[in-house]
């Protein structure tokens, strides 16, 4: 029998947990970050084996899960798309049962249906490292970053600008609504959240008092924002839509003019990375050659400004993932709030 409300549970989408449980994970993340900074060991997962399954490329998520597992005393094992046969030579159910017999927890980054089946059949906690619909581990890091900077969550206004129907916009809208954060989605009409996601968020907002806004009007959407948040304009697998997407989203670029439009000198900028803010990458050079664009969702000036918190946010991926794994697998005493 466990004394933890988290023990043995999977995190597939933010709605899997309650408001108080999300708040606990955020505060636990801050605590673990403090322990890390002070050099205090926290081996809550000593002797545990963690499978890291990636069918999509990853830098921050893979690095965060790997370092988090090691800090917790666990052994992480990376399995890329060439190492696993999910649904190809072996059914997801069969693979899940095998992995569940060898590993104590599984991170998976790919299709939502596969993540759900892994959780259903593996018998161990499964953590969603990113699907097309949701990015729950990123949310703990993001709202941890917000709380670090403002000392609170309730009443803070976070404005997401750009592609408003991708996984980041979905997760920010729903999670923010659960936590009492005011979420503004500022995007072209054709790139706004689905009605299903809006309805889910609205249900939570009524409970927590979140005041949300979904609009194509940049000036109205960013006014009074505490946080400006953006993501890449073209998600994985959408490269064929690049030219169309860039032309559509140019007015939604975070730049210093948009920062001024918030009217808030104490605001911050967040980005889950990677960011296309210059041409110092092969991809950036290629885009510049093809379309004459050197900056996309955020200008280099804004990216390097005093308002930017994207690297603090990236570091927090490790601390938040550590909190998620320790809470769901570490047999910790975490009573119901």
Swiss-Prot record:
Signal sequence extent: none
Reactions it catalyzes: carbamoyl phosphate + L-ornithine = L-citrulline + phosphate + H(+)
GO biological process, one term: arginine biosynthetic process via ornithine
Molecular function (Gene Ontology), one example: amino acid binding
Organism superkingdom: Bacteria
Annotated binding of carbamoyl phosphate, by residue: 58-61, 85, 109, 135-138, 272-273, 317
Keyword Nucleus included in the entry's annotation: no
Keyword Transferase: yes
Compartments where found: Cytoplasm
Family to which the UniProt record says this protein belongs: Belongs to the aspartate/ornithine carbamoyltransferase superfamily. OTCase family.
Record's protein name: Ornithine carbamoyltransferase, catabolic
Gene behind this protein: arcB
């Amino acid at each position: 029998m466990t004394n933890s409300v988290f023990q043995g549970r999977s995190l597939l989408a933010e709605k899997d947990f309650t408001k108080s449980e999300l708040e606990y994970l955020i505060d636990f993340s801050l605590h673990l970050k403090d322990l890390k900074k002070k050099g205090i060991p926290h081996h809550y997962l000593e002797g545990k084996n963690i499978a890291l399954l990636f069918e999509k490329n990853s830098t921050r998520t893979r690095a965060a899960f790997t370092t988090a597992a090691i800090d917790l005393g666990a052994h992480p094992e990376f399995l890329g798309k060439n190492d696993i046969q999910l649904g190809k030579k072996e059914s997801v159910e069969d693979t899940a049962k095998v992995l569940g017999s060898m590993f104590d927890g599984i991170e998976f980054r790919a299709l939502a249906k596969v993540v759900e089946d892994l959780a259903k059949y593996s018998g161990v906690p499964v953590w969603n490292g990113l699907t097309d619909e949701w990015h729950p581990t990123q949310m703990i890091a993001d709202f941890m970053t917000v709380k670090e900077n403002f000392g609170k969550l309730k009443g803070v206004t976070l404005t997401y600008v750009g592609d408003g129907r991708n996984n980041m916009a979905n997760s920010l809208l729903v999670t923010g609504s659960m936590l009492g954060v005011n979420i503004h989605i500022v995007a072209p009409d054709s790139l706004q959240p689905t009605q299903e996601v809006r309805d889910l968020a609205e249900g939570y907002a009524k409970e927590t008092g979140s005041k949300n806004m979904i609009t194509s009007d940049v000036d109205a959407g960013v006014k009074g924002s505490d946080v400006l948040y953006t993501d890449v304009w073209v998600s994985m697998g959408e490269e064929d839509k690049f030219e169309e997407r860039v032309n559509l989203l140019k007015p939604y670029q975070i730049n210093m003019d948009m920062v001024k439009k918030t009217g808030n000198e104490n605001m911050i900028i967040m980005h889950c990375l990677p960011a296309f803010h210059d041409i110092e990458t092969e991809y950036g050079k290629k885009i510049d050659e093809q379309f004459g664009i050197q900056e996309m969702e955020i200008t280099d000036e804004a990216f390097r400004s005093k308002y930017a918190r994207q690297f603090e946010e990236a570091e927090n991926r490790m601390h938040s993932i550590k909190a998620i794994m320790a809470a769901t697998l570490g047999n910790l005493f975490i009573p119901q709030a």
